[in-house]
Amino acid sequence: LVDVRTSEERKFVGYVPESIHVAWATGTSFNRNPRFLKELESKVGKDKTILLLCRSGKRSALAATAAFSAGFAQVYNVLEGFEGDLNELQQRNQSNGWRTHQLPWLQD
């Protein structure tokens, strides 16, 4: 499992134990990480099955598309992401997502 969220998100929101971190974007302005594909290949390799996770599944979908186009044959997006979709009150962690499904996670 590769977490593509920013370092700040992982630190302040939580993370999946033993996940690998390769940020799709960096900082609070979410600037695209130009080294994403090289870092992903270095940390995981192109021949492995890769699950990508972000906050809601949107960035990880973009990352999965980019990785597939770059030759990562078995790359998948984790639907709903770590925090899930916004509910009718514009809040996450209420209706779906990794944490809502009570899957393992930690917070520093």
Regions found by a protein language model. Name each.
Residues E8-T49, S60-D108:
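Rhodanese-like catalytic fold shared by cysteine-dependent sulfurtransferases
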Residues L1-R5:
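Short hydrophobic beta-strand that contains or immediately precedes a catalytic carboxylate
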Residues G57:
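Conserved G/P- and acidic residue-centered "switch" motifs that form tight phosphate/ATP-binding loops
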Residues L52-L53:
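Short, surface-exposed ligand- or partner-binding patches at beta-edge/loop junctions that are enriched
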